[in-house]
Amino acid sequence: MFKVLVISYYFPPMGLSGVQRVLKFTKYMSNYNWEPTVITAGKTGYYAHDLSLQKEAEKANIKIIRTDANDPNSLLAKYGTISMPREFIRKILSMISKFVFIPDNKISWSKKAYTVAKNVLLEEKFDLIFVSIPPFSQFEIAAKLKNEFNIPLIVDYRDLWFGNHFGFYPTPYHRYKHKKLEYAALKATDKIITVNRRMKEMLLTTYPFLSFEDFDIIPHGFDPEDFVNVKPINFETKKLRILYSGIFYENITPKYLLKAFKELSKERPDITESIELHFVGHFRKENKKLVKKLNLFERNFVFVFRNCKTR
């Protein structure tokens, strides 16, 4: 069986989407004759923890090496699951973080993970290094390991690094440094995975040395095992259910939908009474306040965060 070293800060028991993608990749690697060893974060304070994902990783017999560091999340470990701050506060903290840390505030953990990974590679033979980004700092150290040990490297882009539409570069130096770091990391990479074609095209445009053959596109999918023995739910009502799964941040906001729903409720209450809006994930306090401010009918809204095994 071939051996793959997976470097991923985000891994169970942390929750949310980025965690699940890496977990599902590693869960099924053994089916294709690959044995994964995952280097990930130790105890952290995070917006969501999902013990069902942790049990899934244990059931799959994934070897996990947990690495503590001094990144902001690790320093908040004693608080466990922490509340997501209000959006304007999150933006301020994000701007400060992006000014201080290049390429991101996980750089402390990535440096520690590099040391741990180097020791592992000295003790065991691995056939591949796999890294999923963000955080981008772990791509930097994965490329360094590839160059030192001459082991093929695959990077999985869940989000763009340089050119990300949520990216913030406080100074020209920050912008230059981010692009330079990504350029060097990509130069060391043997294969690139992206979640969509648009991301692939942007990378090809930004870095002309890349070719179409360097890429594979693997969209976000689902795990069939999550739906084994799931019984269909027969809803008694015939309401139209509109569901949003995920979180809102930056310019991704529900306020336009909520305001439009309010206007529709004035003009055609008969229509809005037959609609339910479901928000699955973190729904910020300011958005809940907007629902209250607009005096929308409470029965039209469902706010919930579920672990992935909730039926």
Regions flagged by a language model, labelled:
Residues 137-140, 144-148, 173-194:
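Membrane-proximal helix-turn-helix segments that form the acceptor-binding/catalytic region
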Residues 41-111, 120:
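A conserved catalytic-core segment of Leloir-type glycosyltransferases
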Residues 198, 218-221:
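Carbohydrate-associated surface elements
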Residues 163, 183-214:
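A short, active-site helix/loop in glycosyltransferases that binds the activated sugar's phosphate group
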Residues 274, 279-281, 286-311:
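Nucleotide-activated donor-binding/catalytic signature segment of Leloir-type glycosyltransferases, i.e.
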Residues 1-72, 191, 200, 264:
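N-terminal subdomain of nucleotide-sugar transferases
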Residues 72-78, 213-214, 221-238:
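Acidic anion/phosphate-binding donor-loop and adjacent secondary structure
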Residues 234-252, 258-261:
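Conserved donor-binding/catalytic core segment of Leloir-type glycosyltransferases
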